[in-house]
Every structure is written in C-alpha cells, then in structure tokens.
Amino acid sequence: MSTDSVSIINIFLEIKGKARISCQLKRHLSPRTIGLITRSMPIHDNVHRMNKSVVYIKTNIDSGMERKKTDFKKGDIAYFPTGGCICFFLNDVLDGQPMTPIGKLL
C-alpha cells in the first residue's frame, strides 16, 4: 500500500499465483469507509462471484452506507455494507444494489 496523495491510496489486489492488479482507493469518495479499510489491511479471503458483473471478497469491516450509488462502471470498486464485502465490477451495472463507492481497478 502506498499513498501518492492525500486523496488517493494505491494498493494491489493479489490473486495467489494468478495475478496482481493495481487499484486505487479514493478517500474523497468515502473517507470513513476508506479509513476503516486501510486500517484493516492486509485483507485475505477467497474471491467470490456475485453475478456475471461483480466479484467480491468478504471482510470483517463494519461500516454503514456512505454516499451510496446504484450505478457502477467496469473497473469500479465498492463496499457492500450488508455483507461487509469489497466488490469489483467486471462490467457496467445500472440500477444494482446500493453500495459505497471506494475506488477503481487500474
């Protein structure tokens, strides 16, 4: 994890033996949630598929909804408070579950 600015935190999503993906957490999108996530790192879990457009990892992070959105673009990262999950969007999603936007896959 590296901080290149006050607002952007660069991290890597590592899939054991498969890939290492650069991500950016953007503090200005959801400062409270980003703070909880960064203090909880590293986060380890299996990747789960929610549907054809979303994969997620479960966390022990307990944060409520912050600046919720229901529309996400391919490459977005969001926190799903109902399940305590960090979600990664593989395709655009319109009118989905309300989630807290937290960053982007690079």
Regions flagged by a language model, labelled:
Residues 27-36, 40-106:
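Glycine-rich active-site loops that engage anionic ligands at enzyme catalytic sites
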Residues 1-44:
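Start-of-domain signal
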